[in-house]
Amino acid sequence: DSNIATEPSAGVYESGIFTLLSGTEPNEATGQDGDAQDGAPGGPLDLSGNMTVDMGFFVPVSIGSYVWEDLNVDGVQDAAEVGLPNATVALLVDNGSGTFVAATDVDAVAVVNQVTGADGLYEFDNLPPGDYRVRVTPPAGFEATPNQDTTANSDGLAADELDSNIASEPVSGTFESATFTLASLGEPNESDAADGDAQDGAAGILSDLSGN
């Protein structure tokens, strides 16, 4: 288990207080990675050292990135089609029981809804790994394109970055994506050719691989 208790300064983490006494410390678990104490389990050396102070870390994930006006209603972002401004974008997360609720970031702060600008871009970052959905309310007068790709970029190909991922209309005039399972270092590379990519970092480095 992770023993992080505080963050005394940004990016620096500390455990709680451990009082060490000879002959009173935990037995070393057999086969545990990280155990480096000499002596037989339960022996004097083992009982005089605490090998349980482990620290767990992960790479935050992100999701985005584009709401556009589909002029020819084919579900594909063509070169002449531009971003759609004034669309409200919300992020939902599975609460562990299959119910999607408003998302929070890695600091347990509520993720704020975004309103797209003229470029149609949005991005939610600093997220814990999990199952997410994106909910979009377009400006008045706009409807969802009937041709949708709901596979949630399952093949990781750049072409999927151009496809609409709307899967349902839970509320009239509000549209929701399919579920995206985001994992640290497990997401597709962004392509330089696709409008809507707004992720920092070059293809192949950590920040790029942590976004979808």
Residue ranges and their predicted role:
Residues 11, 128-130:
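A glycine-anchored, Pro-Gly-centered beta-turn/N-cap motif
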Residues 71-78, 83, 94-122:
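Short, acidic Ser/Thr/Gly-rich low-complexity loop/linker segments typical of extracellular
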Residues 1-48, 96-111, 147-212:
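Surface-exposed intrinsically disordered loops and tails
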Residues 66-72, 90-94, 103, 137-139, ...:
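Predominantly extracellular/luminal cell-surface or secreted proteins
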Residues 52-78, 82, 88-92, 203, ...:
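A short, Gly/Thr-enriched small/hydrophobic beta-strand-prone motif that recurs across taxa
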Residues 1, 6, 91, 130-141:
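A short, solvent-exposed beta-strand micro-motif common in secreted/extracellular proteins
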Residues 119-123, 134-137:
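Mobile, glycine-rich extracellular loop/lid and propeptide segments
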